[in-house]
Amino acid sequence: MTRRYWNINLEEMMEAGVHFGHGTRKWNPRMAPYISAKRKGIHITNLTRTARFLSEACDLLFDAASRGKQFLIVGTKNKAADLVASAAIRARCHYVNKKWLGGMSTNWSTTETRLHKFRDLRAEQKTARLARLPKRDAAMLKRQLSHLQTYLGGIKYMTRLPDIVIIVDQQEEYTAIRECVTLGIPMICLIDTNCDPDLADISIPANDDAIASIRLILNKLVSAICEGRSSYIRNR
């Protein structure tokens, strides 16, 4: 895998608060190699290491995208939800930003059935067929469609399991992580100072609570995907 330059700036990361971790009492000792200091009861992440692993993640994503691979971005907490959706749409990735439904990947056949139902209901809505049904039936199907849109809207075009999954918050997305581990799907994960760096293939030490921090990391990752996709299109 060729190493590339991704314009990862330490000063920019500091301005975004990427280096701020959790309180020193709320930490995972396995994160010790990624912590540079303690300040006012808060652990400070070593941004040099953040830059290194972020660069490695960008290289991996570029390489995968340039070979036509598919990606899934997962981030369901309120602070991350909108950022995840906009980043995924920009890079034409699948995403989950409301709730990870248990078995979404490990029980893929059930997820596929739900997706087929979702697509059918969307088609019926677009052709105004729902409007021609009895009110009670139409209301029930509209509720069902709304539910499916909330939880499956970001993966509505997904026809197979993703090649790489990007996780925004390890603590919040443990079920998704466990399913990826079970299936052997490679993961890139943002890890704060209370996380386990050994769960993902590439762990990026960063503040996973600040919106500016999440936005910066996601922007770098999806930029790599976009560049990789452009390379894939040029070389087809």
Curated annotation (Swiss-Prot):
CDD domains for the chain: RPS2
A GO cellular component annotation in the UniProt record: chloroplast
Pfam families assigned to the protein according to its UniProt record, in alphabetical order: Ribosomal_S2
Keywords: Chloroplast, Plastid, Ribonucleoprotein, Ribosomal protein
GO molecular function (one): structural constituent of ribosome
Key word Lyase present: no
UniProt KW S-adenosyl-L-methionine keyword: no
GO biological process: translation
Superkingdom of origin organism: Eukaryota
Cell compartments where the protein resides: Plastid, Chloroplast
Family: Belongs to the universal ribosomal protein uS2 family.
PANTHER family assigned: 30S RIBOSOMAL PROTEIN S2 PROKARYOTIC AND ORGANELLAR, SMALL RIBOSOMAL SUBUNIT PROTEIN US2M
Descriptive protein name: Small ribosomal subunit protein uS2c
Organism this protein belongs to: Buxus microphylla
